């Protein structure tokens, strides 16, 4: 006899165990995939090797231009992203990926040097406090697979405010679109195909907009500024689709003239 409960379920190999910690903007929250190997009561969506039980949304089929085309109807794709042979969301190329990879060699201490308050502010999106993990995820050296599922879904979990991963994915993409629009960019370039590279692209653009307002001119802080500056357009008006509106509300840096980070150069 067929179990009627299985008619509306899907086999799941590994289940995402969620630990919510509300301290530090949920930055201590985490996802750990554990062996499951049985039918789950919900349908399952797959993104970047990560199985996601659909607790809040339904399973959507077919290929659409954007992730929003699914969740606007209360759905998530059956599978999508760069790891898919045939993604349900249209593949997309992203800007500033070389910059993200170049910045992956710095840790948060490097970005926290004196004279870099605007750079640090730029890194405070999307998690609410400075974080540079996205550069490692977007690095050329980062290979997504079963071994990276916990890290990737933990990042998505921290971007949202839900206990359900499917809902956190929707919240993450909505946050991406909101920031892209704020920076004068088009939704079509941030369609949810690769959430992490979209986040990396936007963080890089925030850094490009923020860096001119900082004053650090020596040591590791100067190295950070040099990398960022190397990706700034000489004439941003010629690359509006990439550089947006250059919007930034600066934090004015007050550096002591005897401090090693104080500037007496034209950098």
Swiss-Prot record:
Superkingdom of the source?
Viruses
Pfam families on file: NSs (PF11073)
Q: Which InterPro entries match?
A: NSs-like, RVFV_non-structural
Q: Which family does it belong to?
A: Belongs to the phlebovirus NS-S protein family.
Question: What protein name applies here?
Answer: Non-structural protein NS-S
* Organism of provenance: Sandfly fever sicilian virus
Query: What is the gene name?
Result: NSS
């Amino acid at each position: 006899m067929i179990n009627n409960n299985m008619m509306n379920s899907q086999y799941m190999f590994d289940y995402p165990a969620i630990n919510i910690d509300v301290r530090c903007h949920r930055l201590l929250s985490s996802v750990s995939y554990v062996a499951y190997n049985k039918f789950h009561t919900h349908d399952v969506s797959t993104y970047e090797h990560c199985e996601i039980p659909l607790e809040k949304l339904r399973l959507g089929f077919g290929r659409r231009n954007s992730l929003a085309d699914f969740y606007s109807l209360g759905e998530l794709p059956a599978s999508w992203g760069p790891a898919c042979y045939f993604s349900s969301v249209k593949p997309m190329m992203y800007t500033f990926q070389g910059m993200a990879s170049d910045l992956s060699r710095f840790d948060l201490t490097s970005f926290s040097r004196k004279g870099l308050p605007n750079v640090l502010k730029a890194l405070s999106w999307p998690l609410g406090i400075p974080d540079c993990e996205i550069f490692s995820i977007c690095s050329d050296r980062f290979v997504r697979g079963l071994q990276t599922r916990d890290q990737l879904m933990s990042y998505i979990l921290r971007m949202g405010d839900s206990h359900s991963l499917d809902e956190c994915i929707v919240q993450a993409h909505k946050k991406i679109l909101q920031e892209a629009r704020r920076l004068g960019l088009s939704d079509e370039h941030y369609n949810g195909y690769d959430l992490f590279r979209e986040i990396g692209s936007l963080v890089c653009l925030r850094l490009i907009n923020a860096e001119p307002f900082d004053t650090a001119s020596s040591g590791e802080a100067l190295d950070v500024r040099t990398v960022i500056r190397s990706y700034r357009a000489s004439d941003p008006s010629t690359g509006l689709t990439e550089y947006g509106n250059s919007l930034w509300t600066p934090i004015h840096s007050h550096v002591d003239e005897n401090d090693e980070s104080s500037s007496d150069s034209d950098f």
